[in-house]
Amino acid sequence: MCNPEEAALLRLEEVFSATLAHVNSLVLQPLLPAAPDPSDPWGRECLRLLQQLHKSSQQLWEVTEESLHSLQERLRYPDSTGLESLLLLRGADRVLQAHIEYIESYTSCMVVQAFQKAAKRRSEYWRGQRKALRQLLSGVSSEGSVGASLGQALHQPLAHHVQQYVLLLLSLGDTIGEHHPTRELVVNAVTLFGNLQSFMKQELDQAVATQALWHTLRGRLRDVLCTPAHRLLQDSQDVPVTVAPLRAERVLLFDDALVLLQGHNVHTFDLKLVWVDPGQDGCTFHLLTPEEEFSFCAKDSQGQAVWQWKVTWAVHQALHGKKDFPVLGAGLEPSQPPDCRCAEYTFQAEGRLCQATYEGEWCRGRPHGKGTLKWPDGRNHVGNFCQGLEHGFGIRLLPQASEDKFDCYKCHWREGSMCGYGICEYSTDEVYKGYFQEGLRHGFGVLESGPQAPQPFRYTGHWERGQRSGYGIEEDGDRGERYIGMWQAGQRHGPGVMVTQAGVCYQGTFQADKTVGPGILLSEDDSLYEGTFTRDLTLMGKGKVTFPNGFTLEGSFGSGAGRGLHTQGVLDTAALPPDPSSTCKRQLGVGAFPVESRWQGVYSPFRDFVCAGCPRDLQEALLGFDVQSSRELRRSQDYLSCERTHPEDSVGSMEDILEELLQHREPKALQLYLRKALSNSLHPLGKLLRTLMLTFQATYAGVGANKHLQELAQEEVKQHAQELWAAYRGLLRVALERKGQALEEDEDTETRDLQVHGLVLPLMLPSFYSELFTLYLLLHEREDSFYSQGIANLSLFPDTQLLEFLDVQKHLWPLKDLTLTSNQRYSLVRDKCFLSATECLQKIMTTVDPREKLEVLERTYGEIEGTVSRVLGREYKLPMDDLLPLLIYVVSRARIQHLGAEIHLIRDMMDPNHTGGLYDFLLTALESCYEHIQKEDMRLHRLPGHWHSRELW
């Protein structure tokens, strides 16, 4: 059984549908061709608004027809169709939206007086339709303008219809009672359409006020401000207010903008970028905008409250993106708009941001958070901002004169300038990776030319205020030389070492990029020159040459066009040949560059990070970042994203790193932790190690692989091990402090050396081993050559003959290991005696850890003693006279290549605590064997005479 209210709703919808159709044919359809001239911008705008109104009217009619159909179905089949099937109840939101869109389209036309303008174009036609219009309306004065009549015809039926909705739905709610299943739907519909009445009234009031405003403005101001979207919320002529420091004659608050009028000038502020600060005196409040701050002062507290409330809620509404429903300020929380927002703004004031457009996050009138800056000249910056300045990671593009060429800076910024680690790719194809301060290269960094550069170079070292300064390495690919030394103001200045591709080495003093004073020059054939030079290391002035054979030439040297090198001096051929090690193994740079001060630019950022407590926001700025880098310079938009690998992606947050560090303090666990940390390029310790590897390769790989730099390199590796241990201790201190604990007092030298040589050095040495061992190979090439000849000669002898030659006592020979011929003494068997010791010693080449190499040597000694004990059938401790011949035998059968380089590397890198102990003794014994095998009688292919083991000592 249907209610009377449902029948009344049906009749209401029938009448309204017919009215909409009638209005469409009588008013809307004729208005479209009567719109102002489309060739005029205002004419086009009016036509667009009328078309939008026509579209909204059609949508409203369609919804009304659908509602009518649902009512008809309900009345036709009341038993099978429930009350909830009515569109007004189940689809109240949809009906509401159709009404809202219509009223918004209507008021937009009303604000720009589109009806009046259209009526003027067909005034005769509309005068003839007055009677028909009066039939549509109730209470329309015959003296009213045609435009006003058109407006009433388009609005009044809608207002009446909504009013009837509310009345009938209220009555329906009373009829069905509180416990009816659809009671909640009815109450919701009553609320929505009641709110719609309030919304329509507010919209009409604002449109009337806005329309009236245009008549009070001069022509130019009206043209600037008159837009369909504007709705006037407050006018200072109604509630007076003064603005400082800009003395505005009139203040207009629209729903999307705040406008200050000052003479012919119009100052417009987007409400999405207006922040309200309550005042202190009850009559004043403050507004913040991206470029200006204002004080609004009303005559009394009531006026101040009106303005502050309306501005606050207008800002809220603008940020919300749609009009408040049902009225301004309804349903929005909190009472104050958020301080942080997202918006776009183009700066106008003079300064570095003039004409730049910022799009991104804001806070209280300043860019704050993530955003993008674009200048008209093509400059772009995307990244993080703080209080209006670039701060944090950001990418800056600077266009160059060449088309599609940019300088690209992927850096960390502080207070508007580059500060911290960055990667810069220049339009010249040069790339800089390193640190900045106040926008200039400062600290450690690498500058490298492009691969196709006519004069390729790479500088790895320290910078100061944009110039090379301090310790640094420069490789000149064109000249095939590398400079290792000190810099000042972008020039070589101070002690330096130069090495060339040809193997020539120079050490001397530089001043303003030129050699000054005496220096030394070592040639590849080990000739030595001591004197003065030209820039390209040509002998010039007084000097002395010492040749490999001992001859010396002392005098004045020079060169000239067509003359080559010439000299006047004394040639001394009577001098004795020099000690080969005096020149061949002479080391350069030692003492000139204190090892602890060479790479402070690498260590310092890590120390700063630790001293600051390892904050997350400084991790990339101080420790660097991994970034996908390309030399190909692309269009600017391609650069506005940076594929950075954040440290937390692979190793977790800094908190996780420190927590894990605390869980691995026991020796075995610590070793596993450090191995994992050093092998991960995203871990702070791993990053530090990667940078140290880079400096080491820049110095000692390629052209720098020169035997005269071996000591410089090995002391550098040991220093790096100390610094890495100190870095670990720094992280441990921070981890403990975060737990409220303290790190034990500074460790003593012995404890530190034990950890550095026993723990850190073995873990980090593989990263430097290739370049370091190459230097040892070159330094000991001559001895290793003699040693190899001796090994080759000794390998020709069968086991028994070699044992006899080495004067190994026969009762120590492991004869059971041999398959003998009828002549036992001259067995043809080779490589069978002391086989276990030989195979053990060969393992010395399978590790780079000095301690493990010494352990191999100790096990070899044990295998030799074990074999002898087996032969004798009892425990036997070898005296030195018996050990050395047997050790030489094992060394000759192990055939270890470059044994001299191995021995010297082990001695240089082993723990100082082993000095004087068993390892030191065994290494000395191995070194004695190595030196003896180099002797002439060991190298010549002849049956040597007997020798005695005491000759080794």
UniProtKB/Swiss-Prot annotation:
Its biological purpose: Acts as a guanine nucleotide exchange factor (GEF) for Rab5 GTPase. Regulates the ALS2-mediated endosome dynamics.
Record-annotated VPS9 domain positions: 796-942
Gene Ontology, cellular component aspect: cytoplasm; cytoplasmic vesicle; cytosol
Protein name, entry field: ALS2 C-terminal-like protein
Species in which this protein is naturally found: Homo sapiens (Human)
Quaternary structure annotation from Swiss-Prot or TrEMBL: Homodimer. Forms a heteromeric complex with ALS2. Interacts with ALS2 and RAB5A.
MORN repeat start-end pairs: 358-380, 381-403, 409-431, 432-452, 459-479, 483-505, 506-528, 529-552
Leader sequence segment: none
The encoding gene: ALS2CL
An MF annotation (GO) of this entry: small GTPase binding
Subcellular location: Cytoplasm
InterPro entries to which the protein is assigned, alphabetical: Alsin_GEFs/MotNeuronReg (IPR051984), DBL_dom_sf (IPR035899), MORN (IPR003409), VPS9 (IPR003123), VPS9_dom_sf (IPR037191)
Tissue: Expressed in heart and kidney.
Assigned keywords, A-Z: Cytoplasm, GTPase activation, Repeat
SUPFAM superfamilies listed in its UniProt record: DBL homology domain (DH-domain) (SSF48065), Histone H3 K4-specific methyltransferase SET7/9 N-terminal domain (SSF82185), VPS9 domain (SSF109993)
One Gene Ontology term from the biological process aspect of the record: endosomal transport
Disulfide bonds: none
Domain of life: Eukaryota
